[in-house]
Amino acid sequence: MKRIGIMTSGGDAPGMNLAIRAVARKALSSGLEAYGINYGFAGLVAGDIHEFKAADLDDMVSQGGTMLYSARYPEFAQEESQLKGIEQLKKFGIDALVVIGGDGSYHGALRLTEHGYNTIGLPGTIDNDIPFTDFTIGFDTALNTAVDAIDKIRDTAKSHQRVFAVQVMGRNAADIALWAGVASGADAVIAPGFDYDVEAIANKLKKNRANGKDYGIIVIAEGDANSDAAPEFIDQLKQYGDFDARATVIGHVQRGGVPSAKDRVLASKMGAYAVELLLEGKGGLAVGILENKVQAHNMLDLFDAKHQADDSLYQLSEDLSF
């Protein structure tokens, strides 16, 4: 093995640049060459590929997004596109790859491994919805962004005695909502996989009001990218009482910004480990961190598994928001 290719695919996540840096610098320090592939699998098929030098890799540590850009490219599920991508790998002499992205990106990575190009997947998504890893690259930063926004919303909620339903990202995963709900001291959390009762939440807010707390914060997961989750909840809530209530959607600000120290270290550990796996001749693996130990699992096992949110966080939120 002489050359490693690196790409980011799917939605961007803070810390992706640190993963790119770690893969490239680990490859260079191991006597290999590192090549960046712009725009994910679309860029691979188009041959939008360039060589990395060590000097290219240090200015990115504090930058969000991905310096390799990203794109969704469902056409790569077709063998014709895969073969075009492989022709580009041959053209540039790339022997193995690291793909940074979510579960959709892993399917493309596995296809390349099946075609004889060992590929390792790194979990780059704010949703924290990848099996076999406690945390994904970008989750911690997105969580902190959400909590910071909720803290600010609390200020105005308290000033105007209002209830705010704050919608966070995460697709079908509950993690951002659960963690942000506990961290921000929300009065309730509404998230996929957890039952909720609007009337019970309304009664809780009324009880709080009677006890001197005349505002409320409800954290709501978007749930399958439903942009109306928070407004719909507000409409339902008003059926159970005279609430001065507002809906706020935090939105894509959670996908950007300076990556947290935790995401930087996590991405660096995972990126370096991916190169070690490739040096051992391994492919078709997804890197994760479990109980603070970086490890790898077969991608096929990952596709058959389902990410489980931390149920105890939901119960903790309920216990602390009586």
Curated annotation (Swiss-Prot):
NCBIfam families the record matches: PFKA_ATP, PRK03202.1
A Pfam short name: PFK
Binding sites annotated in the UniProt record for ADP: R21, A22, V23, A24, R25, R154, G185, A186, D187, K213, D214, Y215
The keyword Cytoplasm belongs to this UniProt entry's keyword annotation: yes
GO biological process: canonical glycolysis; fructose 1,6-bisphosphate metabolic process; fructose 6-phosphate metabolic process
Subcellular location: Cytoplasm
Chief localization: cytoplasm
Necessary cofactors: Mg(2+)
Active-site positions on this chain: D127
Residues at which substrate binds: T125, I126, D127, R162, M169, G170, R171, E222, R246, H252, V253, Q254, R255
Record's catalysed reaction(s): beta-D-fructose 6-phosphate + ATP = beta-D-fructose 1,6-bisphosphate + ADP + H(+)
GO molecular function: 6-phosphofructokinase activity; AMP binding; ATP binding; fructose-6-phosphate binding; identical protein binding; metal ion binding; monosaccharide binding
Role according to the record: Catalyzes the phosphorylation of D-fructose 6-phosphate to fructose 1,6-bisphosphate by ATP, the first committing step of glycolysis.
Source organism phylogeny: Bacteria, Bacillati, Bacillota, Bacilli, Lactobacillales
Annotated positions binding Mg(2+): D103
Disulfide bonds: none
Record-linked PROSITE patterns: PHOSPHOFRUCTOKINASE
InterPro entries according to UniProt: ATP_PFK, ATP_PFK_prok-type, PFKA_ATP_prok, Phosphofructokinase_CS, Phosphofructokinase_dom, PKF_sf
Source domain of life: Bacteria
PANTHER family for the chain: ATP-DEPENDENT 6-PHOSPHOFRUCTOKINASE, PHOSPHOFRUCTOKINASE
The protein's name: ATP-dependent 6-phosphofructokinase
Binding site for ATP: G11, R72, Y73, G102, D103, G104, S105
Regulation: Allosterically activated by ADP and other diphosphonucleosides, and allosterically inhibited by phosphoenolpyruvate.
Subunit relationships: Homotetramer.
Family per record: Belongs to the phosphofructokinase type A (PFKA) family. ATP-dependent PFK group I subfamily. Prokaryotic clade 'B1' sub-subfamily.
Cellular component GO terms, alphabetical: 6-phosphofructokinase complex
Gene of this entry: pfkA
